[in-house]
Amino acid sequence: MGSVSKANVPKIDVSPLFGDDQAAKMRVAQQIDAASRDTGFFYAVNHGINVQRLSQKTKEFHMSITPEEKWDLAIRAYNKEHQDQVRAGYYLSIPGKKAVESFCYLNPNFTPDHPRIQAKTPTHEVNVWPDETKHPGFQDFAEQYYWDVFGLSSALLKGYALALGKEENFFARHFKPDDTLASVVLIRYPYLDPYPEAAIKTAADGTKLSFEWHEDVSLITVLYQSNVQNLQVETAAGYQDIEADDTGYLINCGSYMAHLTNNYYKAPIHRVKWVNAERQSLPFFVNLGYDSVIDPFDPREPNGKSDREPLSYGDYLQNGLVSLINKNGQT
């Protein structure tokens, strides 16, 4: 295989999106628009989040949680006793077969008395947490991080709205603390010696992968990752490497944005290369509320009309998550 070229992934200073300078916001929006119509990825810098602390706290959690604790937190795909845990909980590694492991948590406002929890509405779950005495401060940190990255995501959605010629709250009004289905996933890719062959996939072009090509199931995805190059995006010139940057957030659109904009902002197809290195991948999947519906539009059309049908976010999310598991396997 020849060398793989580097994808165009600009660094965009998103700090104006938190302020009131409309001209500065529009300049950011123009950069978001250009990136979204190119490779579909950009790095958000000057985002205001302490990512070094995020990385350190996540590392402490990953390195201290025991196999017994993981089992006690495992989602139902791994632990059949946990029938209410479809999304939230621990996703186990499988010795000799699957190396990656992760911990997923949802909206901290989904408490047992939340109306959606009471109604057993799909995709809504109460989070499960490890023992506070064994992981002091972890739950508090994780919940605070959810709201920190929620705030960043709200600002980014204003940038996307302006980029698409909409008023800045066009998306954000559907992204609310009381009902967002957004999730944080704390993914650990371990260094293993030997590394199990069964955990390595091979693409049609011969590239060894940890996770095969896919589009994200989200409106947008806000990703922090270690400074280890691993992601590739499909472009007209073939797959290209996305450079790692552990100071910024890697941003891309999910397939709900592609649906809404009639693929004006596509959901970039990307994949995870196999790299035998201890590293983190910590995505925040920006999801709207279960009943949220935004009418599709086409920015390229003079009247803005799209032939696509409106799709409730709850239906989109349920079907999208199942389809991704069916295609690429249980994460």
Swiss-Prot record:
It is an enzyme of class 1 (oxidoreductase). Residues 176-288 form the Fe2OG dioxygenase domain. This is Isopenicillin N synthase. Its EC number is 1.21.3.1. SUPFAM superfamilies: Clavaminate synthase-like. It catalyses: N-[(5S)-5-amino-5-carboxypentanoyl]-L-cysteinyl-D-valine + O2 = isopenicillin N + 2 H2O. It comes from Emericella nidulans (strain FGSC A4 / ATCC 38163 / CBS 112.46 / NRRL 194 / M139) (Aspergillus nidulans). Changing residue 283 to L: Abolishes the catalytic activity. Keywords: Antibiotic biosynthesis, Cytoplasm, Iron, Metal-binding, Oxidoreductase, Vitamin C. Its cofactor is Fe(2+). Coiled coil: none annotated. Fe(2+) binds at residues 214, 216, 270. Its main location: cytoplasm.
